[in-house]
């Protein structure tokens, strides 16, 4: 009795195998034509008398059992490959599959190859030398399938016959062992033979699988860099993805950058700007943020609790900025003066006001109650300024007084002006004052010296010191604004353009940014040129008021050569931009170093008396009883506040508050805090 020979693992391909190879890439129509013309003949393997072929075939299904939890696991793949290669039922499948598996298993898993011993003399390549991060075997290529998917596949597989189970297991083993190029070719062949429902199934299955969690895969520094490009809404959405994403999206490194982009400036991307809360904290924690971005611990836990998270800072500033934008605020009215309020200033929880009734009142902002009244001047209080220790006031009685506002004591009195004192401004070492006598007086706190700046031909209504550049700005009833050198006492430049008495001048913070256009918005005739009319050219030391045209403003003078000569690397230049307000009902934005009027703000119907500004907005108060909030970059009026029953004579501004004083004897405080 003849016995069947065991299947051979190597040999020439049979007609059946050739037909199967053609069928992989053959269209269904061509396959039907070929099968009708030539039916392949299956030959029974020869017997060598050692074992029965049918018995080996019968054992194959039992030895090809699929391990459900390791369908795509490299270890289970190798065991499946070994089992499959030894239990193949036909010579054709054995002769084609086994060499393929042996070759590619040796290439990809040389250290655990069961087909041939590893050659220790060959240099081992790095695991990621041939693969991108998506296909690196040590990362993603041999990823474990999720439990529900594997269980469902096992249940579906168990419903098939043993031969079908073995065939599918062989196909999985073949695909698992194939390199990237072969896998792509196999997938192309499969996709080419799929019908539309099968393609739809593929699309739905792959949609979620191709998503990569880059936050987990990348180093924290790179993840921080990517997240820092998101806007606020996107960052909040990212924090909802997972715990790991939330941990990174809420980190101080990301929100510190967000605060830098928006707080105290306008973001170029979204157009939002948020008010500055505390500049000191930004400097103190800069080093800590850099260390955290580098993956290092910046501070101890106890120290870290002393600082608010930057996300909380942003949230607070965002709420305040939104309140400014939509005009949501609470109003507190301070009543106590018996005559019109002419000047005011507030800081933290203290408000100081000066009035026609010759008194200065100190108020508690939170309670709205008067703390004390400073008495000593004999006439109207036109100007005041205070810091932590002292308050300085100027009056129409021609004197300047220094007070201890906490105790109410008058420390000293300065005299020297020949007319009423209309304005003052001081820093740590210097006091500047302007008067009805058309002069500016500079008082030195340290050496008690004084200096007089002459050049204006009418009352000096406003002065502002710039400590860094050692300059002072002044505005006058002679329709001009001047900038002076404190070291020499000379006028550096005169700015002309208003057709009404200039009441206020305000240098903007150096952080203020303005997008320039090719020409001035309004006074195109005021642009600097080398050929000004001699009729409108005035000397810096002229003692006569310029001739005023009836239909247009006098042109600005060319920039003085002194400007470029004075300010260089050793001496900082003055702020680049300044604002002015005048009784011609307009405000103007100027470029200081060129003398150009960049923008004119129209909206008030009577003269403007009060002016305050920061990097985000400016506030003006006018004879028309109205207070307006403007965007300095666009020139648009964002909001108008009414309520005063008299002209608004003075205004003051902070990040979350605005105060206005009026001739109706009232002070109104608007709070935009969240």
UniProtKB/Swiss-Prot annotation:
In terms of PROSITE patterns, this protein maps to:
FBOX, WD_REPEATS_1, WD_REPEATS_2, WD_REPEATS_REGION
Pathway in which this enzyme or protein is active = Protein modification; protein ubiquitination
**UniProt xrefs under SUPFAM superfamilies:** F-box domain, Quinoprotein alcohol dehydrogenase-like
Which part of the chain is the F-box domain? 212-258
Q: Where do the WD repeats start and stop?
A: 336-375, 377-415, 416-453, 455-496, 557-600, 603-640, 643-674
Which keywords does UniProt give here? Repeat, Transcription, Transcription regulation, Ubl conjugation pathway, WD repeat
Low complexity composition bias: residue spans: 56-96
Segments carrying the region annotation (Disordered) are 1-96, 518-561
Q: Which portions of the chain have biased composition (kind: Basic and acidic residues)?
A: 518-544
The record ties this protein, via Pfam families, to: F-box-like (PF12937), WD40 (PF00400)
GO BP terms: protein ubiquitination
Q: How does the record describe its quaternary structure?
A: Component of the SCF(sconB) E3 ubiquitin ligase complex.
Family (UniProt): Belongs to the WD repeat MET30/SCONB/SCON-2 family.
Cite the PANTHER family for this sequence: UBIQUITIN LIGASE SPECIFICITY FACTOR/HREP PROTEIN, UBIQUITIN-BINDING SDF UBIQUITIN LIGASE COMPLEX SUBUNIT
Q: What does it do?
A: Component of the SCF(sconB) E3 ubiquitin ligase complex involved in the regulation of sulfur metabolite repression, probably by mediating the inactivation or degradation of the metR transcription factor.
Task: Give the protein name, as stated in the record.
Answer: Probable E3 ubiquitin ligase complex SCF subunit sconB
Query: What is the organism of origin for this protein?
Result: Arthroderma otae (strain ATCC MYA-4605 / CBS 113480) (Microsporum canis)
Q: Taxonomically, what lineage is the organism?
A: Eukaryota, Fungi, Dikarya, Ascomycota, Pezizomycotina
Name the gene.
sconB
């Amino acid at each position: 009795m003849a016995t069947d020979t065991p299947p051979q693992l190597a040999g020439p391909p049979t007609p059946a195998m050739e037909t199967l190879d053609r069928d992989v890439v053959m269209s269904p129509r061509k396959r039907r034509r070929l099968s009708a013309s030539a039916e392949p003949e299956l030959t029974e393997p020869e017997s060598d008398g050692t074992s029965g072929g049918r018995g080996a075939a019968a054992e194959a299904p039992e030895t090809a059992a699929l391990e459900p939890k390791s369908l795509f696991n490299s270890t289970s793949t190798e065991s499946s490959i070994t089992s499959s290669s030894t239990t193949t039922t036909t010579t054709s499948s054995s002769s084609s599959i086994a060499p393929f598996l042996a070759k590619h298993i040796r290439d990809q898993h040389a250290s655990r190859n069961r087909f041939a011993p590893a050659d220790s003399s060959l240099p081992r390549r790095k695991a990621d030398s041939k693969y991108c991060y998506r296909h690196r075997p040590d990362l993603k290529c041999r990823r474990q399938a999720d439990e529900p998917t594997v269980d469902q596949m096992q249940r579906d597989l168990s419903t098939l016959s043993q031969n079908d189970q073995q065939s599918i297991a062989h196909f999985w083993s073949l695909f698992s062992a194939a390199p990237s190029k072969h896998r792509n070719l196999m997938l192309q062949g499969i996709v080419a033979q799929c019908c539309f429902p099968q393609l739809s199934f593929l699309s739905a299955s792959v949609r979620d699988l191709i998503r990569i969690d880059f936050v987990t895969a990348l180093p924290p520094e790179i993840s921080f860099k990517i997240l820092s490009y998101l806007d606020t809404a996107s960052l909040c959405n990212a924090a909802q993805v997972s715990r790991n994403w939330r941990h990174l999206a809420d980190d101080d490194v990301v929100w510190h950058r967000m605060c830098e982009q928006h707080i105290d400036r306008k973001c170029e991307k979204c157009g939002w700007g948020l008010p500055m809360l505390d500049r000191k904290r930004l400097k103190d924690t800069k080093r800590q943020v850099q260390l955290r971005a580098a993956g290092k611990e910046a501070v101890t836990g106890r120290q870290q609790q002393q600082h608010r998270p930057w996300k909380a800072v942003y949230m607070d500033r965002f709420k305040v900025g939104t309140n400014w934008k939509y005009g949501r605020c609470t109003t507190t009215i301070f009543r106590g003066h018996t005559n019109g309020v002419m000047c005011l200033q507030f800081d933290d929880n203290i408000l100081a006001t000066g009035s026609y009734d010759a008194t200065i009142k100190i108020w508690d902002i939170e309670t709205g109650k008067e703390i004390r009244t400073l008495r000593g001047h004999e006439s109207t209080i036109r100007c005041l300024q205070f810091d932590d220790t002292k308050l300085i006031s100027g009056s129409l009685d021609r004197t300047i007084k220094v007070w201890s506002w906490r105790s109410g004591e008058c420390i000293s009195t300065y005299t020297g002006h020949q007319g009423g004192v209309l304005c003052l401004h001081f820093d740590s070492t210097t006091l500047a004052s302007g008067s009805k006598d058309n002069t500016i007086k500079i008082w030195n706190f340290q050496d008690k010296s004084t200096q007089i700046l002459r050049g204006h031909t009418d009352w000096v209504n406003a002065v502002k010191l710039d400590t860094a550049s050692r300059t002072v700005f002044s505005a006058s009833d002679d329709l001009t604004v001047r900038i002076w050198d404190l070291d020499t006492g000379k006028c550096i430049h005169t700015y002309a353009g208003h057709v009404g008495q200039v009441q206020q001048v305000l240098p903007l913070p150096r952080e203020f940014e303005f997008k320039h256009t090719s020409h001035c918005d309004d006074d195109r005739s005021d642009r600097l040129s080398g050929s000004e009319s001699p009729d409108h050219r005035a000397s810096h030391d002229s003692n006569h008021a310029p001739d005023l045209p009836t239909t247009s403003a006098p042109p600005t003078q060319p920039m003085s050569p002194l400007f470029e000569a004075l300010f260089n690397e050793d001496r900082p230049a003055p702020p680049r931009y300044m604002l002015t307000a005048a009784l011609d009902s307009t405000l103007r934005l100027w470029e200081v170093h060129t003398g150009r009027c960049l923008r004119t703000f129209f909206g008030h119907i009577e003269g403007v008396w009060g002016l305050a500004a920061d990097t985000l907005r400016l506030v003006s108060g006018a004879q028309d009883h109205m207070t307006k909030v403007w965007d300095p970059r666009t020139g648009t009026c964002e909001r108008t506040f009414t309520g005063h029953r008299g002209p608004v004579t003075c205004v003051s501004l902070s990040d979350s508050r605005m105060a206005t004083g009026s001739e109706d004897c009232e002070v109104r405080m608007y709070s935009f805090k969240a």
